[in-house]
Amino acid sequence: MRVVVISSFVSVSLQLSFLLLLASAIRSSSSPPNDPFLGISPQDEKYYKSSSEIKCKDGSKKFTKAQLNDDFCDCSDGTDEPGTSACPTGKFYCRNAGHSPVILFSSRVNDGICDCCDGSDEYDGHVSCQNTCWEAGKAARENLKKKIETYNQGLVIRRQEIEQAKVGLEKDAAELKKLKSEQKILKGLVDQLKDRKEQIEKVEEKERLQKEKEEKEKKEAELAAQQGKGDAEEKTDDSEKVEESSHDEGTPAVSQHDETTHHDEIGNYKDYPSDEEPAAEGEPTSILDEATHTNPADEHVVERKEESTSSEDSSSPTDESQNDGSAEKEESDEVKKVEDFVTEKKEELSKEELGRLVASRWTGEKSDKPTEADDIPKADDQENHEHTPITAHEADEDDGFVSDGDEDTSDDGKYSDHEPEDDSYEEEYRHDSSSSYKSDADDDVDFSETTSNPTWLEKIQKTVKNILLAVNLFQTTPVDKSEADRVRKEYDESSSKLNKIQSRISSLEKKLKQDFGPEKEFYSFHGRCFESKQGKYTYKVCAYKEATQEEGYSKTRLGEWDKFENSYQFMSYTNGEKCWNGPDRSLKVKLRCGLKNELMDVDEPSRCEYAAILSTPARCLEDKLKELQQKLEKLMNQDKPQNHDEL
């Protein structure tokens, strides 16, 4: 029994000894590095060397320099163990001289795998790592040299584009100023043409209404004349019966009536109501008969007047007798003109107007209501008209309107006493009517100094001025259709030109408000689109407008232009088409230095959120070029690293 206990005790002691030896071996394999600052980045060296007591970066506790890289984790964030694998959250910095530095998790230190090209992560000697940084860095240095060359060339292009942007902006500003000036002048001309067009349309409308009125009155007069003619025929039959009866009974006929009685009856016709017309025995019973049928008594009176006039002319050679004879002859002529006018206009005048007209020729009284007989021109009046200029006030009252009746009178030549107006009067009158429509724009333009090769605006000004002079709304003839059409055509063309100018002004104003960068380096982007074909899609990015994804004939809007972001490193497009059951589409375009504008690497890293890269000379910055040159210089000045055989 005692022997068994002793043997068990010996067995346990051997196991413990083995475990202690194993722990000692493990302890020696993870021994601290010879360099206490191994694994610390150059940026953090000052933090560790500033004092003898170091504070954990998370602020939890402090540790001494002796505790730094002692292979025991004192800080939960691994601040005290950057060069060992003691802390799971620690970071190890590979310097990789001659190549690019690398940061590793501390758990990969002394794990038997060479992670750093300089072999610094396997310092315990269990693995021999060759230093391959110089060879590996050779390709990186070549790429860096190419990148520097791209920046150099791109910087030259960028400077050129900046100069072109300055010129372009100045040109845009000058064009905007010129267009605004032209807009002001052209708007004045368009306003003048619009006023004249509206005036012409008013006159045309007035003429149209007057023509409709006259046609209506003419139809009413024709209807009344037809009705009156029927009444006259009935009354004529009655009158003939009365005359036959009077002849059979020996009663004197109408021809036996005294001239004075006939004068009194007709002269006092207007004293009777229209529905109580006097009807003398043996005379016509209507005024229409008086106007349309020749009265024997009237012929007798005219013949007697002519005979008395001729006898008085022969028997009285004195001046006074001659004057009396001339006056009677003129009176006879006037009577004849009235008779002729009545014959011509009998269908257009009402019964009442015919009655007044016939009565007035005997009594010498004028009707209270003016008739067309008042328009019969007199020789003396025509002579006075030829030598009496029309005043502006009279022209305004006339309003430039001429009825169709006046047109017929002048065209038919029935009253050819009118003579053509003096040409000098027409020119003087036309000049006066044009000056009333002169605007401020006319005062600003001197057409006498127009060059032999005038601009389009000067041509328009001259054309409008000629039109305004040619179209005279106060003339005594109806509106000339060809001139009216000319005004409308010029108004339409000038209005179209004005709209184009206003559209261009709006476009320029919007353009000049855009953000073209601190040095206007993105000015050349305005109005340009960049495309990239990737798979079945074609991506199109238009600066200051929109970005789209196209497939065949379908187009998806990825976003509208928003702004530049992160110091002009990105172009942002937002508020695109909504994704099904998702957000609105958007796009961010990363800008990088390149010798030409080229869109590439379009991707969708998140649902409906797109990303792309655009190379452009606009991003070849001088500060970035200096940074790259310094980096290359540092790499080239490094000595060729030695192999870590001693490790």
From Swiss-Prot:
Explain what the UniProt record notes about the effect of disrupting the gene for this protein.
No visible phenotype under normal growth conditions, but mutant plants have compromised defense response induced by the bacterial elicitor elongation factor Tu (EF-Tu).
**Pfam families associated with the record:** PRKCSH-like, PRKCSH_1
Composition bias, kind Low complexity: at what positions? 311-320
Which SUPFAM superfamilies does the UniProt entry name for this protein?
Answer: Mannose 6-phosphate receptor domain (SSF50911)
Sequence motif: Prevents secretion from ER, positions = 644-647
* Assembly and interaction partners: Heterodimer of a catalytic alpha subunit (PSL5) and a beta subunit (PSL4).
Q: List, for all copies, the residue spans of the domain called MRH.
A: 527-622
Q: Which gene encodes it?
A: PSL4
Q: Which GO terms describe its biological process?
A: defense response to bacterium
**In this entry, which stretches build a coiled coil?**
155-235
This one is known as Glucosidase 2 subunit beta
Extent of the signal sequence: 1-30
Native source organism of the sequence: Arabidopsis thaliana (Mouse-ear cress)
InterPro entries this protein is in? Gtb1-like, Man6P_isomerase_rcpt-bd_dom_sf, MRH_dom, PRKCSH, PRKCSH_N
Q: Where is this region: Disordered?
A: 206-453
- Compositionally biased, Basic and acidic residues: which spans? 206-222, 230-268, 290-308, 326-355, 363-388
- Tell me yes or no: is Coiled coil among this UniProt entry's keywords: yes
Entry comment describing in which tissues the protein is expressed = Expressed in roots, rosette leaves, leaf blades, mature stems, cauline leaves, flower buds, flowers and siliques.
Stretches of Acidic residues bias are at 395-410
Q: Would you tell me the Gene Ontology cellular component terms? A: endoplasmic reticulum; plastid
Q: Does the keyword Chloroplast apply?
A: no
Q: Which PANTHER family match?
A: GLUCOSIDASE 2 SUBUNIT BETA, N-LINKED OLIGOSACCHARIDE PROCESSING
Annotated compartments: Endoplasmic reticulum
Role description: Regulatory subunit of glucosidase II. Essential for stable accumulation of the receptor EFR that determines the specific perception of bacterial elongation factor Tu (EF-Tu), a potent elicitor of the defense response to pathogen-associated molecular patterns (PAMPs). Required for sustained activation of EFR-mediated signaling, but not receptor FLS2-mediated signaling elicited by the bacterial flagellin flg22.
